[in-house]
């Protein structure tokens, strides 16, 4: 405790401050800091001639620290009398003003603030010189118009200015001298320029008008170039553009100490063919990505750049260059610099920009026609196109383009590697770097490197966003002139690069080279003679060979393929091909093919496999659970019987087309409807009134067309055994007749023109139709598809509407698509979809080399093919087969009509209706076959 008290007494005696213990109810002592190191480093033996006869020793504090010698002024409860001055006291500008006190209590000062005096502290001359560059001031301003400065006056009229310390907490209060005069000490923010006035107003409002405040002058220093700023915002803005490295001034101080050594090393470097100002080889000197702001030279490394700045662009103009705008550091370096102008072949340089030239008239021309000219209008323009030039030789070379004269490549500038000739030596040197792989110019903003400085400058425009070249037609801007020239060819329609094989023309030579590879097909298949353009296409083709090599075991009856003999044997053991099972398998196949609409979202699909995949992916449910759920009645009412097709091969089901050509037009359409009652244990419906139409058509009211629920009897199975086969035959015939009449009445309303266009589709057309449907689902948004009537509308209609909606008129194309068959029409529509609607160059290139069917499958991907293979395997396990077919021998066309479903009891039954259109002979054949069957089989049927 005694040691701390002695320290406080010493600090207090530095300016003659009384150290009186503060009262308990006062705040902690306020600290003030002298930013100039006046008392730093002095010996404890140095004495003064005032009340403070000895200064404290501050050897522990290093010079350059944030805090200099600190003065701690303690609070005083009672105003004390000043001590008597000792021998050797200095003169003061105001009497009895050597004591400064800080009081926490608020008192109104009786007089204005006067200057504070103290004795001089002796400092060595070296220390004094080092402190000359500090400019430290604390300014206090009154609410009145009088402004004074608080200073510490020394013996030799020197002033020691001080400010409040930043790192110590400043307690607001008043400074009072021996005469009772007080100085208000306020707390200012770090940014004085913005917040100082507001704080001053708050503090001054608490006292009288005679109260004053002390403002801090805080200097914010840049850590790179050590430039000071009054505001934080100014410092932040400066840091964005400061080009100096953080340690440049430290290295500059070392170079100043070793200036003589640098001069000796410069002479040695010149003898070794190394540039003395940047220490780079003369082969690639002054060529890099770090540009000098004072001259046109650039450098590869930061060290070379700093050495150049230190030697060539000195802050003093004691040794200026007589040729260029450089200011050398010493006379010896100036001599080397001027010798460099002469020995390196460019003795003439511009005083403004520093660019050097080999001849004097080049310099004069530069000074006349460049931005360094006093008269900026000294330019030369082309009289043909009004283009402006600064050099006469550039104008002459430009005029050769109008005359049609081409610059001839000189054979002396020939590359020995590729035997190409160039216009000049500089272009040859740049070209040689493409063979050697040398890229000396790297971008400082990314990792790219370039073989020429021009390429680096063009690349940097992409980082800066500079686009100096703009199109006069569409005002689109570009960073490189070559890109603009290529863009202009789009407006003019110029395509100078033409393919010799197919005659196609392109804008760029690279596009032609890429296109030529399509004719070369460098990837041949080792197993066949086919060739492919890309390696990916070859890999896809090789997979087809692996699939065909796999052994196939076919069923002799149904021509079905199986992977293993065990699967084939299992298929034969199931007895699917026995006469008794063929009819049930037909009905099971019809049952499988019937359900293609989703019971959740009412969306229709081409096949049950697509429906299953939709349920798994979209609704995330098990398809087996959904298949047993009936759709909502409101959704079922929207579906017509004629909107479903069982046999995709025969789309023409009109009455005229179903009559065989061999009947000479005398055939009659007779439709037979097979009603699947389910297994024998389920409840069945007994037709009690044959005069009723028992199938709900077009969502009619159930009570009008169906028998009521009283017609459904639990004991229906027993009653069925009492019905004779003749009655059942008549009932079945009446049912078929009524259904045929109902369908004929609603045929024109419910069936679309495309479904009954009278065209017979092949298997390829059916596959194309399915792929087009998937393509439409993938490319067009669902709201637009719903607007066009999808999925109820046919694929061809929706595809035509999509193409016409995109602005292409199918009637003005000059082609009559109506004369083509279904497959050709769909292929032409798909080509229009890819070329006119979808602007994709990769798809267009595929169309030039592959048929449209392959392009559609390529767009859809290989997923459908893989799933198709899995579906075949699953079908082989299940043993179900599609038994509905069309044969020319029997002249039979089959379609499926799907009626509305009626829930009769808890175990509702699905009725599946299959219509057969046959002529008279075939219909009688069917009736005779039904007569031959036993009664039990008829009941089961």
UniProtKB/Swiss-Prot annotation:
What ranges does the record list as Basic and acidic residues composition bias? 869-880, 891-941
Question: What's the chief localization of this chain?
Answer: nucleus
Cellular component (GO) terms are: chromatin; nucleus
Keywords noted in UniProt = Chromatin regulator, Chromosome, DNA-binding, Metal-binding, Nucleus, Phosphoprotein, Repeat, Transcription, Transcription regulation, Zinc, Zinc-finger
Region spans: Interaction with mod(mdg4): 760-860
Region listing for Disordered, in residue ranges: 1-97, 176-211, 864-941
Instruction: Give the compositionally biased regions (Acidic residues).
Output: 185-202
Question: Where does the record place it?
Answer: Nucleus; Chromosome
| Biological process, per Gene Ontology | heterochromatin boundary formation; negative regulation of DNA-templated transcription; protein localization to euchromatin; regulation of transcription by RNA polymerase II; response to ecdysone
Zinc-finger (C2H2-type) residue ranges come to: 220-242, 290-313, 319-341, 348-366, 380-402, 413-435, 441-463, 469-491, 497-519, 523-545, 553-577, 596-619
* Residues recorded with modification Phosphothreonine: 186
What InterPro entries does the database record attribute to this sequence?
Zinc_finger, Znf_C2H2_sf, Znf_C2H2_type
- The annotated regions of Low complexity compositional bias extend over 47-57
- From the UniProt record, which GO molecular function terms apply? chromatin binding; chromatin insulator sequence binding; DNA binding; DNA-binding transcription factor activity; euchromatin binding; RNA polymerase II cis-regulatory region sequence-specific DNA binding; sequence-specific DNA binding; zinc ion binding
- Its job: Component of the gypsy chromatin insulator complex which is required for the function of the gypsy chromatin insulator and other endogenous chromatin insulators. Chromatin insulators are regulatory elements which establish independent domains of transcriptional activity within eukaryotic genomes. Insulators have two defining properties; they can block the communication between an enhancer and a promoter when placed between them and can also buffer transgenes from position effect variegation (PEV).
State the oligomer form and interacting partners: Component of the gypsy chromatin insulator complex, composed of Cp190, mod(mdg4) and su(Hw). The gypsy chromatin insulator complex interacts with Topors via mod(mdg4) and su(Hw). Upon ecdysone stimulation, interacts with Nup98.
Give the protein's recorded name. Answer: Zinc finger protein su(Hw)
Q: Which gene encodes it?
A: su(Hw)
């Amino acid at each position: 405790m005694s040691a701390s008290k002695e320290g406080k007494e010493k600090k207090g005696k530095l300016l003659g401050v009384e150290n009186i213990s503060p009262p308990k109810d006062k705040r902690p002592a306020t600290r003030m800091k002298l930013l100039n190191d006046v008392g730093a480093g002095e010996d404890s033996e140095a004495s003064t001639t005032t009340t403070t006869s000895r200064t404290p020793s501050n050897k522990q504090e290093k010079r350059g620290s944030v805090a200099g010698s600190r003065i701690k002024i303690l609070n005083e409860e009672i105003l004390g009398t000043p001590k008597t001055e000792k021998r050797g006291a200095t003169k003061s500008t105001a009497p009895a003003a050597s004591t400064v006190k800080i009081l926490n209590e608020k008192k109104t000062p009786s007089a204005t603030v006067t200057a504070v005096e103290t004795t001089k502290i002796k400092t060595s001359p070296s220390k004094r010189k080092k402190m000359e560059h500090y400019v430290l001031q604390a300014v206090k301003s009154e609410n009145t118009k009088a402004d004074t400065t608080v200073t510490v006056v020394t013996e030799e009229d020197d002033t020691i200015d001080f400010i409040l310390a930043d790192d110590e907490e400043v307690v607001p209060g008043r400074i009072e001298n021996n005469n009772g005069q007080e100085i208000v000490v306020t707390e200012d923010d770090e940014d004085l320029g913005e917040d100082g006035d507001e704080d001053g107003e708050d503090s001054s409002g608490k006292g009288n008008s005679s109260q004053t405040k002390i403002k801090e002058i805080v200097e914010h220093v840049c850590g790179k170039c050590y430039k000071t700023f009054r505001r934080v915002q100014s410092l932040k803005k400066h840091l964005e553009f400061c080009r100096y490295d953080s340690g440049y001034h430290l290295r500059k101080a070392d170079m100043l100490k070793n200036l003589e050594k640098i001069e000796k090393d410069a002479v040695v470097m010149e003898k070794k063919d190394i540039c003395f100002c940047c220490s780079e080889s003369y082969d690639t000197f002054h060529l890099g990505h770090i540009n000098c702001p004072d001259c046109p030279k650039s450098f590869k490394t930061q060290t070379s750049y700093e050495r150049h700045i230190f030697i060539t662009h000195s802050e003093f103009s004691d040794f200026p260059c007589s040729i260029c705008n450089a200011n050398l550091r010493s006379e010896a370096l100036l001599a080397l610099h001027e010798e460099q102008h002469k020995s390196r072949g460019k003795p003439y340089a511009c005083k403004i920009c520093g660019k050097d030239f080999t001849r004097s008239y080049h310099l004069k021309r530069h000074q006349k026609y460049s931005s360094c000219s006093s008269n900026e209008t000294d330019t030369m323009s082309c009289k043909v196109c009004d283009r402006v030039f600064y050099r006469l030789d550039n104008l002459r070379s430009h005029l050769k383009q109008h005359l049609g004269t081409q610059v001839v490549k000189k054979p002396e500038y020939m590359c020995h590697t590729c035997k190409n000739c160039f216009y000049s030596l500089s272009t040859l040197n740049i070209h040689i770097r493409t063979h050697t792989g040398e890229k000396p110019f790297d971008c400082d903003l990314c990792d790219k490197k370039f073989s020429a400085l021009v390429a680096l400058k063009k690349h940097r425009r992409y980082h800066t966003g500079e686009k100096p070249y703009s199109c006069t037609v569409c005002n689109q801007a570009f960073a490189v002139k070559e890109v603009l020239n290529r863009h202009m060819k789009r407006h003019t329609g110029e395509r100078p690069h033409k393919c010799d094989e197919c005659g196609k023309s392109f804008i760029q030579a690279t596009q032609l080279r890429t296109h030529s590879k399509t004719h070369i097909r460098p990837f041949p298949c080792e197993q066949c003679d086919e060739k492919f353009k890309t390696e990916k296409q070859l890999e896809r083709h090789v997979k087809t060979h692996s699939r065909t090599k796999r052994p196939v075991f076919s069923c002799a009856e149904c021509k079905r393929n199986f992977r293993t003999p065990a699967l084939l044997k299992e298929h034969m053991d199931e007895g699917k091909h026995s006469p008794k099972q063929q009819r049930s398998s037909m009905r099971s196949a019809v049952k499988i093919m019937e359900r293609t609409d989703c019971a959740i979202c009412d969306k229709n699909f081409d096949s049950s496999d697509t429906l299953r995949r939709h349920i798994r992916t979209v609704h995330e449910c098990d398809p087996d659970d959904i298949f047993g759920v009936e759709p909502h009645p409101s959704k079922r009412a929207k579906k017509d019987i004629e909107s479903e097709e069982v046999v995709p091969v025969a789309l023409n089901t009109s009455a005229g087309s179903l009559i065989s050509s061999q009947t000479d037009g005398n055939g009659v359409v007779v439709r037979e409807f097979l009603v699947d009652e389910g297994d024998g244990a389920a409840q069945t419906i007994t037709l009690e009134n044959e005069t009723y139409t028992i199938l709900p058509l077009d969502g009619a009211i159930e009570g009008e067309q169906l028998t009521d629920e009283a017609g459904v009897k639990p004991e229906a199975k027993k009653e069925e055994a009492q019905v004779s086969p003749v009655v059942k035959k008549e009932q079945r015939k009446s049912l078929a007749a009524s259904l045929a009449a109902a369908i004929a009445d609603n045929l024109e309303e419910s069936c679309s023109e495309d479904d009954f266009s009278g065209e017979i589709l092949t298997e390829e057309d059916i596959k194309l139709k399915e792929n087009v449907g998937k393509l439409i689902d993938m490319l067009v948004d669902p709201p637009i598809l719903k607007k066009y009537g999808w999925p109820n509308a046919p694929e061809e209609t929706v595809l035509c509407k999509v193409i016409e909606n995109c602005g292409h008129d199918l009637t003005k194309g000059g082609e009559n698509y109506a004369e083509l068959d279904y497959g050709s029409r769909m292929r032409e529509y798909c080509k229009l979809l890819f070329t006119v609607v979808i602007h994709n160059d990769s798809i267009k290139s595929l169309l030039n080399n592959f048929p449209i069917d392959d392009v559609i499958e390529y767009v859809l991907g290989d997923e459908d093919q893989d799933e198709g293979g899995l579906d075949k395997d699953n079908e082989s396990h299940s043993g179900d087969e599609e038994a509905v077919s069309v044969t020319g021998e029997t002249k039979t066309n089959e379609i499926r009509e799907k009626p509305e479903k009626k829930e009769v009891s808890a175990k509702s039954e699905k009725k599946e209706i299959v219509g057969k259109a046959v002529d008279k002979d075939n219909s009688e054949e069917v009736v005779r076959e039904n007569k031959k069957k036993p009664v039990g089989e008829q009941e089961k049927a």
